[in-house]
Amino acid sequence: MKKILFCLIAVCLTACSLKTSGGTILDGGNNYEIFYEANGGGLVTEKPTSLFLQFGATMKKKKGESCFMAASDVDTLLKNLRAKEVFKESGECFDNVYYFSPLISDYVIVNGQKVNLHVAFGAENGQAKVATPINFGGY
């Protein structure tokens, strides 16, 4: 009986741990992509399952994530992540803003500064592309 009770408690604790630690940190987005480290050192992207978005459980080494979200929702995300602007750059039809959040563990060095959150404005339909640590590929 003690073994069964112990196993039940262990399963419950594991489930609670997954629920509180996992999922995406980019809440409120759509069209998610997850970046994983490939065997050769490059990056592989995958569309996450709904279970991943809820719990975040994976056996792969996650290197980052991205999604699209309404530009009007970005401020709420930045506030929730306690992100501070590091620098920004603009072009003819885009604005890139780079942030650092103490709540995101991984970061990259850009222009000698730590960056772990990248917001690219300029998409159609009032959408922004948000990524950790930066947007990979084209936008």
Regions found by a protein language model. Give the residues of each.
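N-terminal export/targeting and maturation segments
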Residues: C16-S66
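Mature extracytoplasmic domains of secretory-pathway proteins
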Residues: F52-V110
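A cross-kingdom marker for long, charged
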Residues: V110-Y139
